[in-house]
């Protein structure tokens, strides 16, 4: 299994890893503040070990470091290597999310939900405008996915059926033009129902809804974003069939493209789970196990139903290695105890270092308490100015038991950068290097 750390045994190091068949799931939650060595200490060794096992890996790579250092090595090991590069788009393979739909109505709903949720203000509940814009988006996705060549009657090439196509329709066509297109569709066309619900709103609001949805998709003004989301070169089912290494390179500063990385992982989990059920072994597991190395997890965007996903994908042969800077960051992205459900589904937790009180207190409680023995001594006392020299209080010593945290929060914050804590369900905490 994955290497978690090393211990000094008589002058040489022994590496510690998870044994397979131990009854634990392979989800790992890793906490590490900036500079704590998450990439060097966890991600890179994990990639090397996974390559030995010939398992697939999907790696979030915030600075493109892992792609630069490991992609050639992985190709030499027989891996199919692809990059969905939202940082340096010139060097990206194409991935068109509408190419994953295959006429599935549920997938259309999921794509629309991810886009609306990741382009709304944090903490904002879905209101009238969100719901109306979502119905408009669902209708447009159905319409664009079924666009056909008027001469041959065949579906248009996938690069002409993309989210960029929807943005172009919103920016160049009026509501009357779109109305005419929707009326020309067959009565049983899947775009008609959501468009009909959208039109239940007062007609004087339609223009505002067009503008609102267009604003959510305005990243498609960028020609490179249009290009990498139009062509379809990344197969989301392939990692379950043969060893693949996909690098999703994101910006940890620009959040405007978060909905694309969230779409990538939301559909990836869904496609792999579906493939496992249809083509897996008798237990419904993938032929090739897939590891999701979710570095900078909180900057990927909100993955659809992630707390439910992480609790079910283990049985499909999909394992998540979540890496966050702090528990506070997790709680901000997945509030109201949702983050604790996610952490609770990880049987292994690593603490590489933190500098915030919430994470330190959380890990301190997870480490539990220990019993210590305290000895209290009282020396003999003689009054200073008394002419009588006899002892007033004799020497006393008492011993008692007390409890204290295995590690106080301040001790966790003061851990050396070369140390880490390993917390495994059913085992005592372990401090290693």
Predicted regions and their residues:
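P-loop NTPase motor domains
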Residues: 3-14, 19-320, 328, 333-336, ...
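Conserved ATP-driven motor cores of ASCE-family P-loop NTPases powering translocation/secretion/packaging/pilus
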Residues: 310-312, 316-424
